[in-house]
Structures are given as structure tokens and as C-alpha cells.
Amino acid sequence: IGKWNNAFFLLFFDKDTKECYPVCGKADCTHDNMECNAYVGYQYSKNRQTTTYYLDSAVYYYKDNVYLLDTNGYLVRFSTDGSTREKIAVVYAYGGESGTNLVFHDDYVYVYNLLGHLGNEEEAVETIKRYSLDGKKEETVLEYTGTGAAITRAKSYGERLYFLIETATMSKDEKANKVIMNSRYNSLYAYDYKTGTAGKVLEGSI
């Protein structure tokens, strides 16, 4: 994602010319407004109010398409030839910050929040949800209940989705006059795509 004509666009870097171009295949497009297929908008900044809606976060590539999250909560798909841009589904609720991460497998996207409830003193439920990439199906595939916890570092290998559970507590550093988060990874888990079941793979701190 880069700045082009005073807004942000999905860009392609040409290794031969060493230049960037908007990923837009529209005929006669001027690449300077929201009608452009490469249009992203203004990336979110904590220090200013903006009217856009794309997160300053990861760009995902899966099966010849590029995916981004926007601050309206949508997963948005861009074709790599610039011919289309489409909103697939609302996959999370945006509240000013987002730890939302994605893992793609078998035409589904698995969505989790790596911030979760880290540092909270009350018990809460962390989830992994999946959405079909045609936007027609949504379901919660995993729930973890814990205190001050979050699901993190999810990776897809073979027929399993592996992830860690991170827990954190907050403490006050009186000398530095600041609050410190103390976190650790607790056990490795795996979700089986075929059976829909999950369990611990490795016990204890990692």
C-alpha cells in the first residue's frame, strides 16, 4: 500500500522500471479517486481523524487475490490484475485499534484477535471464527476461556491450524511511573480442519 495522488492505493512494484503503479485494470481510470479498483483511502492514524477505512496492517495474498481489512470491519478482496475490488463480509468490530489477524485455508479465512483480553483481570472467551470466501458462511470454530488471554501466532500447516495462547498481567513500575505488561505463551494448540476439533500439542510455557 502506498501514497498516490494524495490518497492510498494498492500498488505494484515493477522490478524492471523500479517504479510503482496502481493495481487497477479499469480502462481510462485516472487513479485519483475511490472509483479506482486500487483505491484504499487514508490509512488509519491514532493521532488524527480520517474518513477512510483501511487499517495500517498486513496485506494478505491467497489464490491470486490480495486481501485487506478495512475499519468498517470488512474483509476486502482485490484481484491481482486490477479488474475487481469487492467487500466479502464483516469479519470483526473495529473500535479504534485492531489486533485482527487472518489465516487462509481451503477457501475459508480464519479470523482471530491477537490482542484479545490481554491484561484483563476478568475471565473472557477468545475465539477463532471462519468465513467462506464467497461471503455466504460464518461460524465460530474454536473458543478458549481464560483470564488476561489472547490467541496468537496462528499458522496453517497441512490439515491443522496451530496457535499459541498468550496470557498477560499488568503491574505498576513505581520507579518509572508506568504500567508494564508481563506476558508469556502458554501451550501450543492445534485445530484440525477435517474433524473440527482442537487440543493441546505441547504443554506449558513456550
What is each residue range found by the language model?
Residues 9-37, 73-93, 119-145, 171-204:
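Surface-exposed loop/turn elements that mediate protein-protein interactions on large endomembrane-trafficking
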